[in-house]
């Protein structure tokens, strides 16, 4: 193989690697965007839960207890 063919082969291999890396990066970017949406949703749910706890007993000196949530039949 002469030098020109060797360079063409190396350039072709680099182009293939670059295309594969672009696909991987696009996939990772989509995954990061999906995880960001999930995190935003979880943060909103946590804020809502915290607000409900505060609204339920805003002047409480004691921390919130799950025992307060026991149904009356227990």
Curated annotation (Swiss-Prot):
InterPro entries reported for this sequence: SlyX
Disulfide bonds: none
Pfam families linked: SlyX
HAMAP family: SlyX
Family: Belongs to the SlyX family.
Protein name: Protein SlyX homolog
Organism: Neisseria meningitidis serogroup A / serotype 4A (strain DSM 15465 / Z2491)
Gene: slyX
